[in-house]
Each structure stands twice: as C-alpha cells, then as structure tokens.
C-alpha cells in the first residue's frame, strides 16, 4: 500500500484563512479605532512578538533565557544611536537594532552555552545586567538617566506625513499608527517564519534536541549548531522589536530598556500561562495578560501578586498552559506541525494506516 | 573486508582501565555478540566505536578509514547507527517523525527524499500501525522496536545494539529476535551487547567475552560457551 505524509488539517486551513482576514482587518483598523486602542494594540503585538521568540528559544530550543532584555535594550539603544549620532530616520534605524542584538548574541551564546539549565538562565541574566551597566556609561546617549529622540527626528519620520493626510489625524497619532503597522507586520512575519521553521525539517530537529539531546546527536542532528541558530535568530528579531518599541516611546533609559520585568518576566508569564512549546500558546497568553493588566492595573502590588498566583496555579494544574488544556480536551490545533502518515487507498481516498501485528496490544 | 576494526584500544576513567588494549575486527555482513559481567566495559566499547568517547590509546578503523578522532556526528553520517540501552525516543514526536528526523539528518537528505525508506523500516520493525502515535505513549517492546527502527533510519552500514532484548517477556523477545534476524539476513553488519544469551546466540556468528575491559575470548558461540575460562568468569560455574 502507498502512503503519503500530510501536515495540513481542515482546522489548520480555516485558521490560516482567519489569520489572513485578521491581519487585513488589523491593517485597516486605524481608520476607525481611537488612538488609545492603537497604542494598546501596539503593546500587545510587540509583547506577542517577544513571547513567540521566547517560546521558540525555551519551548522549542530548550534554551530558558532570562536575559532577553539584553537584546531589547541593545536594539533600542542602537536605534537611538543611529538617530542621534548619525542622523538617521528612526524607522530606518530599526534594522540597526536587529544587527546590534545579533552582534551581542554571539559572545552571549559563547559564554552562556557552556552553562546548563538554571545556570544558563542565570548566566543570560548576568550578561544582560552587564550590558545595561555598560550602556549606562554611554554619555552621548544620556548615560544612566537616558535621553529622548530629538524633535526634528520624530517630526519627519518616513511615512508619517502620508498617514496624517490619509486619516486626517495629528502627527503624534500618525506616528502611533505607523508604529502599530510595523508591530503588526513584525508579529505576523515572526509567527509565519516560526511556523514555517517548525514545518521544515529543522522543526523536527529542534523537537528532537528538546526531547533528548544525546539521542538527537546519535542520529546525526548537530544540536550545537541548531541551538546557535535559534539563539541568533531570536536575538535578531528581539533587537528589532526593542528598536520598534522605542521608536514609539521616543524616550529611553537603561533601566527601562533593559528591564527584566517588562521584557522577560512578563513575556515568560505570557508563554507559560498560554502554553509553552505551541504557537497558539503565546497568542492566548498575551490576551489573558492584557485582560488581567487592564482590569487589575489599579490595584498596585495586588496586580503583581495576582499574576504570580495565576502563574503558579497554571504551572501546577495545567503545565502545558491554557492552550494545552484546551487542545487536549478538543484536539484542536490552529497551527498543525505534526506529520501524519496516511494510506492512499485507490478505492476510497485516504485512510489512516491500519495493520495488525502479531502482538497487537 | 573488515567493516570496523579496533587495534589496541584503551580507555581509562582516572585510574580505572575500562577498556584495556582491546583488538577485534568485524567483517562486513557479520553479527558479533558481546557478553561480559556488569561493569566489564561493554557500553564503553560502544561509545568508543560511535565516537562518544575518544580512546586514550589505539586506533578505530571504519570502512577502511581511521576514525579514531572523528566526532560522533561524522560517524553517524558515515554509517554507524546505534540503539541505547534505555530507550531514548523523542517523546513529543510521533513514531514516524522519530524516523524522519533520523533518516533526514543521519543521511543528510530532505524529508521528502526519505519518506519511503522510513515507511519500509516501519514495516520491517512492525511499527507501521503505530506510525502516528506519540513515541512517549509506546509500550516497552514498541520503544525497543523504535530504538532499532530509528538506528536503521540513519542508513547504517554497522548497527550497534545495546541490550535491546533486556526487560522484555519471552514472547516479546522472540518477536524482536525475528526482526533482527531478518535485518541481518538482508546483509546488515551488527555488533550486539546482550545479557539475554539465547537471543544473542540465535543471531550472531561470533561471540566476544569482555571482563575488566579485556577481551578474554572471541570465537564461535559454541566454542566460547564451552570454554572453561568463560564459564568461570562470566557464568560463575565452577569447572
């Protein structure tokens, strides 16, 4: 009997169409949505991108980094350097952020990859702190107190004038819309790229390395190279995201740009409650996080306590996250990556392989 | 032609000589069984052949090339396939995906190019009916089968089996022996470490006895099992 390998599912195709519709709606949304909603969506989309990248690192690559704020911070500072020192357009300086993060990721990986498990996590955190302290010495960019993007740089960002006349809004609102569009593009491209990666043979290798590194090596998977690749890719895109966040904020300080709470702890929370090791996890997680944040933000310390308790509860009772819980119950996968072997029966289409062995159990 | 050859290979862990000037060769197409008491250095010997350990002295030759200093990854691609003593499946992947990753990376081919081979191996190892099952949910016998199938998927010239029959019931053991016999009959060269002697003697042409890291006997299974030294050391039978 002949067989073929299938990844596609009906739910997956429906989800794909829905995702495209959602992205199109997202792009035309600024025509009707108020400015604070666009700002909120910007925050959600950048957090989603960071969460997807952390999920790629920890959930697929087994690299539990607590130092991703290093790449957000260095990316943001590189963008600021491009604008303030070399007079670049802030939006065009965003790629500098990615490159700077990539350059920082090489020595970071070199040192951190010598460490395992919890030591790796702490090692990445230490490197992020060292980077923060070094950047705080950069007097041209405000040193320890930070600085703002100069007025003349933010006033004529590429595309802002066109958005102003298109939607008939003020310059500041037009800048938010531009940043939002970029965040939407970055989030969509990141998810699409990770999805492509997972469906590729590299996705199988990643899963193999995560499940059992020794066994992966014994079948010819170069575990070291794969971890390097994942770490560098995640750092590059995290750097881009950091730069984009600070194009919108337009004000930077080392403490904010290298904040372990904002750029790593919240991101880990999102991935853990949503569901680690699944593309759907961070999407659900960021929605839950946003709802909690907007309903509990007025309660100060209680807000953080609640986040902590929810994280603990999810880890104890739903270790695969809320999405894991849902997909276990329903069998739902919006982004199917599993290869299934289907028999091609010339009489009646396809059916799953069935064959009784002598010791069927 | 000798597929794999060890010449005076030694490996020490501190003061302990785990492998002591071991020499033997396995011609292409032969099955060699390795027996010896616990701690005799059997698994270490495997790690020296796969490249997971580098020897302190001696030479390992595979396919006529000196591979003594070659890393494990290179040797997988040259055709050294192994199974682990304790099955180590990729639990989050399906049985088919376990084979696909081994075949694709072990041979450096695209996923599509190895699909048919994976299906054939699944058939040979009686795992086809479980192709879409998550490896983490398999029974012990099927995990052992998956170890064998995944090693086969890398496209080996030499198959190293580490106590693959251990822990199975008599019936399960027979099923696995039949599978290994079939692979060997198709020309596969095998080195097999096993405590379940009857499983070993049902397949191999030669037996090697290891004790305290030294080869104390190598030859036809009947002759080895009859030798006084082996009976004393390994089987603990007073001669």
Located regions from the model:
Chain B
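Glycine-rich phosphate-binding loops of nucleotide-dependent enzymes
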Residues: 2-239
């Amino acid at each position: 009997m002949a067989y073929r390998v299938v990844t596609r599912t009906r739910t997956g195709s429906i989800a794909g169409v829905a995702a495209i519709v959602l992205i199109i709606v997202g792009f035309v949304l600024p025509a009707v949505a108020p400015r604070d909603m666009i700002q909120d969506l910007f925050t959600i989309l950048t957090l989603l991108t960071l969460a997807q990248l952390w999920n790629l690192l920890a959930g697929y690559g087994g690299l539990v980094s607590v130092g991703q704020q290093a790449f957000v911070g260095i990316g943001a500072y590189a963008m600021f350097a491009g604008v303030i020192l070399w007079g670049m357009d802030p939006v065009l300086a965003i790629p500098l952020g990615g490159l700077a993060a990539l350059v920082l990721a090489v020595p970071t990986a070199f040192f951190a990859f010598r460490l395992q498990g919890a030591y790796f996590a702490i090692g990445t955190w230490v490197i992020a702190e060292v980077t923060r302290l070094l950047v705080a010495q950069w007097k041209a960019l405000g040193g320890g107190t930070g600085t703002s993007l100069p007025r003349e740089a933010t006033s004529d960002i590429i595309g802002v004038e066109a958005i102003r006349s298109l939607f008939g809004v003020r310059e500041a609102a037009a800048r938010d819309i531009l940043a939002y569009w970029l965040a939407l593009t970055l989030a969509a491209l990141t998810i699409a790229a990770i999805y492509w990666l997972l469906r590729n043979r590299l996705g199988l290798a990643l899963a193999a390395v995560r499940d059992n590194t020794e066994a992966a090596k014994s079948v010819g998977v170069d575990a070291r190279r794969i971890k390097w690749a994942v770490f560098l890719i995640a750092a590059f895109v995290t750097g881009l995201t950091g730069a984009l966040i600070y194009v919108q904020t337009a004000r930077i300080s080392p403490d904010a740009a290298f904040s372990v709470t904002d750029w790593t702890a919240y991101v880990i929370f999102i991935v853990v409650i949503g569901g680690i090791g699944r593309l759907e996890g961070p999407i659900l997680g960021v929605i839950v996080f946003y709802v909690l944040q907007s309903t509990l933000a007025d309660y100060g310390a209680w807000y953080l306590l609640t986040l902590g308790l929810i994280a603990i509860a999810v880890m104890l009772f739903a270790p695969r996250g809320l999405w894991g819980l849902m997909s276990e119950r329903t069998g739902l996968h919006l982004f199917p990556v599993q290869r299934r072997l289907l028999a091609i029966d010339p009489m009646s289409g396809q059916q799953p392989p069935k064959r009784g062995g002598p010791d069927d159990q | 032609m000798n597929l794999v050859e060890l010449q005076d290979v030694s490996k020490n862990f501190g003061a302990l000589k785990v492998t002591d000037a071991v020499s033997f060769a396995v011609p292409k197409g032969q099955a060699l069984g390795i027996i010896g008491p616990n701690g005799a250095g059997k698994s270490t010997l495997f790690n020296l052949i796969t490249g997971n350990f580098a020897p302190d002295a001696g030479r390992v030759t595979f396919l006529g090339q000196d591979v003594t200093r070659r890393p494990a990854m290179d040797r997988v691609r040259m055709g050294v396939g192994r199974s682990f003593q304790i099955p180590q499946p990729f639990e989050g992947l399906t049985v088919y995906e376990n084979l696909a990753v081994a075949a694709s990376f072990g041979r450096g081919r695209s996923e599509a190019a190895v699909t048919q081979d994976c299906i054939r191996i699944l058939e040979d190892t009686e795992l086809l009916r479980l192709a879409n099952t998550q490896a983490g949910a398999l029974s012990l016998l099927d995990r052992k089968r998956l170890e064998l199938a995944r090693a086969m998927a890398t496209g080996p010239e030499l198959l190293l089996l580490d106590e693959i029959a251990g822990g199975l019931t008599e019936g399960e053991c027979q099923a696995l022996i039949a599978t290994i016999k079939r692979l060997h009959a198709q020309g596969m060269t095998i080195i097999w470490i096993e405590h379940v002697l009857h499983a070993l003697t049902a397949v191999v042409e030669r037996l090697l006895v290891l004790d305290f890291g030294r080869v104390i006997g190598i030859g036809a299974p009947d002759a080895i099992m009859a030798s006084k030294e082996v009976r004393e050391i390994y089987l603990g039978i007073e001669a």
